[in-house]
Amino acid sequence: MMLKSVTESFAGMIHGLKVNHLTDGIIRRSKRMILDSLGVGFLGTGTEVFHKVTQYSKIYSSNTSSTVWGRPDFRLPPTYAAFVNGVAVHSMDFDDTWHPATHPSGAVLPVLTALSEALPQIPKFSGLDLLLAFNVGIEVQGRLMHFSKEAKDIPKRFHPPSVVGTLGSAAAASKFLGLSLTKCREALAIAVSHAGAPIANAATQTKPLHIGNAAKHGMEATFLAMLGLQGNKQILDLGSGFGAFYANYSPEDLPSLDSHIWLLDQQDVAFKSFPAHLATHWVADAAAAVRKHLVTPERALFPADHIERIVLRIPDVQYVNRPFPDSEHEARHSFQYVACASLLDGSITVPSFHSQQVNRPQVRELLKKVKLEHPPDNPPSFDTLYCEISITLKDGTTFTERSDTFYGHWRKPLSQEDLRNKFRANASKMLCRDTVESLITVVEKLEDLEDCSVLTRLLKGPSVQDEASKLSSMSSFDHTTLPRFTNI
């Protein structure tokens, strides 16, 4: 039977994809995304924004509940567990980034861990069930972004995870819970009415809510569809539907499942080595290279007093152009700050964005010397952008270095061991060593897991009586910096 609309072809894909459609490459890449998302989520549970959203969410209760990651004695209704865990994943802007531009995992993974725990079934949810639903949620996001030329660039008007992430969440939940094709279509339609958040809230405590809301609202859309709520049957076909988010929206029917090719097989994600906007990673890479001209065995400190001018040649991305950031969230979205901190310190780490680091007098003085240039051959795309840094000394000497690809970008991916080390450094903030290592083992063999409760039990973290043991084991980790990556 011919499918009648783009919307129905999406519902058909969500409903029709099976475990045997998963390729070895898809399983491998998605397990890396899951491990990284869990790690940055555990780290994010220590942030101020996470504390605020958990305090808010405590007013809700339900007969069914799910784990808040790393909090064994704190459970929430599944929609709110997905919300706060999604906020945790994006609370420090440390989560994965895709092309076209979005953060794909944070709106999907918290939904699936919450559902697998809150709605047990027979047979039980398996690791393959989770991997399939996760990849369906990622695939829907990617397919939607490919309908717009605008989506290929770094966003200017709205934050993509708040839009495509909401539909990815609904798709993943619909697949996980086995909804019919018709119910999958309704879940997408309902999710569109929950979607969207302006990019103006980037660099604030509100930005992480975009991911949390996408997770929560996609799950809500799925529950409402299960209860029979209906929406526009052509929501993805219409300029007044999903096309309202894009000026140049041009949707197309999806290929048949017989010829299905996963977008993640064709386009990997980027993993970050420090918690800041992805575009700043090119800046840090170029700054580290130019610093080698100025910091030598004979001169161990960066000669800030000798600097006349620092020029950054980068794309024109207004919300990452912050000459004098006043907060950790602004610093994470500042080309200028990341350049100066990299030059002064030699590397960027989690504490680089603490307020006392951001407001150092040496940093503020160096920021005054930074100028931005936007070369016409450097458009704002995570696939093609570059950063060139030129430093001119007061004696007229100039040093220039350029980064086209940083370590962690999909063209230069993190090794599996470095990804594990990032996870260890992040997750050890909340978990004892044994739990950290057990999670690595479980995620890396997720396709063999017969019961997802093995995973969700580990996500709870230590019980109260285990706290002393946890604190003892944490003493062997360095929590102030991420491990030095071996392939840089």
Swiss-Prot record:
Q: Which GO terms describe its molecular function?
A: aconitate decarboxylase activity; protein homodimerization activity
For this protein, the record's InterPro entries field holds: MmgE/PrpD_sf, MmgE/PrpD_sf_1, MmgE/PrpD_sf_2, MmgE_PrpD, MmgE_PrpD_C, MmgE_PrpD_N
Gene Ontology biological-process entries: cellular response to interferon-beta; cellular response to interleukin-1; cellular response to lipopolysaccharide; cellular response to molecule of bacterial origin; cellular response to progesterone stimulus; cellular response to tumor necrosis factor; cellular response to type II interferon; defense response
- Identify the gene encoding this protein: Acod1
Across the pH scale, how does activity change?
Optimum pH is 7.0.
Instruction: Provide the assembly information.
Output: Homodimer.
Q: Which UniProt keywords apply?
A: Antimicrobial, Immunity, Inflammatory response, Innate immunity, Lyase, Mitochondrion
* Group of enzyme by EC: lyase
Output the lineage of the source organism.
Answer: Eukaryota, Metazoa, Chordata, Craniata, Vertebrata
Instruction: Please identify the protein, giving its name as recorded.
Output: Cis-aconitate decarboxylase
Tell me where in or outside the cell this protein is found.
Mitochondrion
